[in-house]
A protein has these predicted regions:
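Conserved catalytic core of the tyrosine transesterase superfamily
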Residues: 1-312
């Protein structure tokens, strides 16, 4: 935590975000976006003009800022102008750039096997298995509690995930077995005194009563990927992409995959159709059909003669 004084403008913006129940990560992102704009202006953002916004957007375009990060900054500024300052004229000047539609990276089944085989510990293997076996986001994995594991119904409950939505995912026998192994060896000294159902599956070793961080999960994932010889750019989220893609290649209904991933729109899930290489490679090319020898079809007259039966 910093000791930086909170200005009245920032305090009002924080209150506006809390009133709309924006998650903590979104709030931090919006504040950082406005701080960046203020640093560019060298004065408070509530004094900004249309020309200031135009110059700032040109500045971002000329610097090494990705389209994704640039759009995040614009989202924060739009909230400031539209909600906190009620300056709709300035909010309209803030625009987003369409991001290139890139295919999500996916690991092959063989790469997944290698990744899990070289996991340096049972904890790492369980963490990675939750990503691939259940399609969970990194933030969902680290925030799992005992109460979320429903052995009676063979499901894992994901509470208040992205978009503040709850959902259920499958709990396979293999995954349940791994979780049982982990629970037997999991250190309990980090959450002594906490009711059993409220205990984190992966507690922090540094902060009592807190879960491990996504940064720690990311480090464990990359250590395993390097040991497995996986060179392409992958992250823990690649496990989720691979989960969806491999289910599609097993002919799992797209609607079911949408529910498991927690996507609001089916179109979001449908993008995995573009990376399901097993489905794509199974489609016969029309070029192959051209190369196949044609079977000679009998002429109509001959066919008719064959069909005529001799008189009894």
């Amino acid at each position: 935590m910093t000791t930086e004084a909170i200005t009245p403008l920032r305090q009002r913006m924080i209150e506006d975000m809390k009133a709309r129940k924006l998650c903590a990560g979104t709030q931090r992102g919006h504040i950082l976006s406005c701080k960046r704009f203020a640093a560019f202006l060298k004065r408070s953002p509530d004094t900004a003009t249309l020309e200031d916004i135009r110059r700032f957007q040109l500045h971002l375009a000329e610097t090494d800022v990705s389209i994704c990060n640039r759009n995040r900054i614009m989202t924060g500024l739009r909230f400031l102008f539209r909600v906190t300052l009620r300056r709709l004229d300035l909010a309209e000047e803030v625009y987003h750039i369409r991001e290139p539609q890139k295919l999500p990276p996916v690991m092959s089944v063989d790469e997944i096997k290698r990744l899990l085989a070289v996991a340096s510990s049972l904890k790492t293997r369980v963490l990675l298995s939750l990503g691939y076996g259940c399609g969970l986001r990194a933030s969902e994995i680290v925030r799992l509690k005992v109460k979320h594991i429903d052995r009676a119904q063979n499901i894992i409950r994901i509470e208040q995930s992205k978009g503040r939505k709850d959902r259920n995912v499958m709990l396979s026998d293999e995954m349940l077995g791994l979780l049982r192994q982990w629970w037997k060896t999991r250190p309990s000294r980090y959450d002594a005194g906490i009711p059993l159902q409220e205990r984190w599956l992966f507690p922090s070793r540094k902060s009592a009563g807190r879960p491990m961080t996504t940064r720690q999960l990311n480090r464990l994932f990359h250590e395993a990927a390097e040991a497995a010889g996986i060179k392409k750019g992958v992250t823990p989220h690649t496990l989720r992409h691979s989960f969806a893609t491999h289910l599609l290649e097993q002919d799992t209904n797209l609607r079911k995959i949408q529910l498991l991933l927690g996507h609001e729109k089916l179109e979001t899930t449908a993008r995995y159709l573009h990376v399901a290489t097993g489905m794509i490679s199974a489609v016969e090319s029309p070029l192959d059909r051209l190369a196949r020898p044609k079977h000679k079809r009998p002429r109509k007259a001959e066919k008719n003669r064959k069909e005529v039966q001799p008189p009894a």
